[in-house]
Amino acid sequence: GRTVAEMVTAEGWESFRRQEQTALRTVSAPRTVVATGGGMVLSAANRIFMREHGLVCYLYAPAFVLSERLARAPEATQRPSLTGEAIADEVATVLAFRDPLYRTTAHCILNASAPLQDVIEQAVAAKKPPAAD
């Protein structure tokens, strides 16, 4: 396996996004959790596929929270820069563009700033069908 940075350096973003799309379709199956990368929603075909083939949950967190997480994460060096900006600026720029895509693709929006147990409870509640009246 290669990191995203290695794949992008060797083959470019377009090739990476094609492989990402193939992977989405390959791993999608009933009763399966698929955690995608943030760029998955850039393709309209991916957005449609995800909405039609599963329950899409957007794990929302403000840009400053995401920036802090990326700065602390050891795998941060494996992530190629999308804009060439500092992490905080890049996250704000990218999130501003992608947030509407995430929101229109998602069936539910979860507060990813909450403690992990709360996020899990939100996800479980989101998957349950509505109670009968």
Q: Over which residues does each language-model region extend?
A:
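ATP-dependent small-molecule kinase phosphotransfer cores
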Residues: 1-40, 44-51, 72, 101
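Glycine-centered loop/turn positions within well-structured domains
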Residues: 2, 14, 57, 64, ...
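Short beta->alpha linker loops
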Residues: 22, 61, 86, 114-118
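Catalytic metal- and UDP-sugar-binding loop of GT-A-like glycosyltransferases, i.e.
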Residues: 36, 59, 112
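Short glycine-rich anion-binding loops that position phosphate/pyrophosphate groups of nucleotides
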Residues: 38-41, 62-64, 115
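A glycine- and Lys/Arg-enriched "phosphate-lid" helix/loop adjacent to the NTP-binding pocket
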Residues: 52-99
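NTP-dependent small-molecule kinase module
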Residues: 55, 68, 96-133
